[in-house]
């Protein structure tokens, strides 16, 4: 399938992905960042801040930023690393991944530059395949060590999900797990046995998480299902009102209509020897949520009954 590369008015080239059922996605070369994913009813499923700065070298608030080679401030580099602030290239040799002929996809690559080597002196190739199929968006990141010595890194795909009202959202699949609370100097806690709900700022890294997490939007009767491999942690973030007002690239009230649930490898950095490659995978899909006695039953989603 030929690539639909568009040069938009904001000056940021992007690849448009479409598939027969009518869903679509947009992927910027800047940051290798997915900035739109719409379902077959043309409803936007990803959150994008109305104040997002679409101008390098700023990071873009929304969509699915790629955090590499550092997540957050866990290191000496800029917040969340530099991959989200670099212009990627189309990857004409994406082997050894199998062909994605049966779906709409794009392969991108980011290689270390002389400028990056000054701040992170490690030679690498970061590849990302974004694939769109009916009701599903799949991202496959790969990192290859092209250096002469081993290196380690942390990584995350930050999923800004569009929700109707954060106070009506709950997350299933992270119950009873340990997490680091970034609002408490990364102190370690154990989550309660109930689903996660939101009534204030949340910034947590959940550890050793399952491969499937459900994000249930009561008001829209829609459930996001996040499946992931190679990224054992999950980051859950919402800035709430005070933090949102302090963010220059986010409107004061927009925290109500977004939630970040990230696929991440944070607690234990990934170590690659020369010429070794790491591969992750994340799959986002949506299902209609059914009510029972006024409550959604995400257990069916988590057990794969949908």
Tell where the protein language model's regions lie, with residue ranges:
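Beta-strand-rich recognition/accessory modules
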Residues: 1-23, 30, 40, 111-117, ...
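Extended, loop-rich substrate-binding clefts of extracytoplasmic carbohydrate-active enzymes
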Residues: 4, 9, 77-134
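Acidic-aromatic substrate-binding/catalytic surfaces of carbohydrate-active enzymes
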Residues: 20-80
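Asparagine-centered strand-capping/turn motif at beta-strand->loop junctions
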Residues: 27, 141-147, 286
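Hydrophobic small-molecule pocket/channel-lining residues, especially in calycin-type beta-barrels
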Residues: 31, 41-43, 53, 116-123, ...
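Short, hydrophobic/aromatic beta-strand segments
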Residues: 36-38, 149-155, 293-295
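Beta-rich strand-turn-strand
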Residues: 133-136, 147
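Active-site/ligand-binding surface loops and adjacent short beta/alpha elements
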Residues: 150-152, 156, 160-235
């Amino acid at each position: 399938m030929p690539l639909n590369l568009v040069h938009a008015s904001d000056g940021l080239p992007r690849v448009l992905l479409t598939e027969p059922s009518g869903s679509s996605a947009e992927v910027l070369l800047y940051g290798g960042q997915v900035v739109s994913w719409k379902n077959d009813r043309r409803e936007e499923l990803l959150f994008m801040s109305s104040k997002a700065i679409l101008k390098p070298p700023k990071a873009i608030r929304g969509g699915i930023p790629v955090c590499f080679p550092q997540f957050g401030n866990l290191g000496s580099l800029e917040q969340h690393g530099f991959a989200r602030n670099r212009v990627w290239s189309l990857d004409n040799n994406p082997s050894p991944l199998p062909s994605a002929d049966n779906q709409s996809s794009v392969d991108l690559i980011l290689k270390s530059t002389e400028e990056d080597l000054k701040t992170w002196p490690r030679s690498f190739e970061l590849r990302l395949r974004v694939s769109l199929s009916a009701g599903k968006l799949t991202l496959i990141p790969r990192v290859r060590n092209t250096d002469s010595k081993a290196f380690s890194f942390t990584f995350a795909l930050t999923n800004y999900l569009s929700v109707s009202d954060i106070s009506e959202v709950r997350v299933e699949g992270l119950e009873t797990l340990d997490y680091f609370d970034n609002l408490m100097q990364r102190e370690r806690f154990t989550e309660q046995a109930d689903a996660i709900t939101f009534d204030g700022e949340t910034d947590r890294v959940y550890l050793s998480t399952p491969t499937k997490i459900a994000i249930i939007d009561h008001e829209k009767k829609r459930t996001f299902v996040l499946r992931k491999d190679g990224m054992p942690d999950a980051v859950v973030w919402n800035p709430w009102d005070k933090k949102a007002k302090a963010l220059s690239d986010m409107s004061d009230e927009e925290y109500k209509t977004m939630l970040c649930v990230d696929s991440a490898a944070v607690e234990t950095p990934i170590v690659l020897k020369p010429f070794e490659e790491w591969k992750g995978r994340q799959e986002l899909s949506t299902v209609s949520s059914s009510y029972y006695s006024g409550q959604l039953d995400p257990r069916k989603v988590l057990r794969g009954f949908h």
